[in-house]
Amino acid sequence: SSKLSVHEIITLSSIVELEGAKAADRKAVAGVFYNRLDSNLYPTLGSDATTYYASKIDDWSYSLTYKELNDCNNKYNTRCSSNTGLPIGPICNPSIDSIVNITILLIN
């Protein structure tokens, strides 16, 4: 994961944007998801934000159903064992802060 394309950086940054509720949290969130890209312990990203996006749900108080959590045909669902790595594209327009946090990880 040390060499991500611009598309992959924006995609990962968009996950960080929605998973990190506050800007102060996004550095840690970026580290977690970046490390999961190369982890044998975490074969998938397991992002709630991508699973909600995959199910076209924008109400985070909604509890995802078993069917939604296990819809592996949707390439945005990063909880499925068949959907490893990043989803097929961004799930939102990430802030500069989220992009910078991912870029710093790539540089270090």
Give the ranges of each region predicted by the language model.
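Bacterial extracytoplasmic/cell-wall-associated proteins, especially those involved in peptidoglycan
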Residues: 1-108
